[in-house]
Amino acid sequence: MNQNFVVTKSNYFIKNSSYDLSLEEQRIILTLSSLVQPEDQDFKVYTIKIAEFLELIGVVDQSKYTELPKITRELMKKVFEINDEVTGDFLQVAWLSAVKYKKSSGEIDLEFSPHLKPYMLNL
């Protein structure tokens, strides 16, 4: 997997959202974000080899392999807010809608929350 990634986020999202993520959680989100293509109309199920995924998020200790489900579970619990400056409304949303570990193939499937589409697609 190429380690030169480009991540695109809307300026609105950057200015009007607040979230608190650990370094590993940030790396997961940025790695996953880099798989979103500019022409994508919808989020996909992003499948990554677990060994490559651990390397990409900077986990070198193989004992962390067993901690990866804990890291993604904690990430799925992280709710953040996106504020609408015009209406005063705000959205509370989690980054991920699903994570599936496929032990037989050594892969992990990750899915962004569909509520993030306006902030990450068609930019």
Task: Give the positions of each predicted feature.
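Charged, alpha-helix-forming regions
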Residues: M1-L123
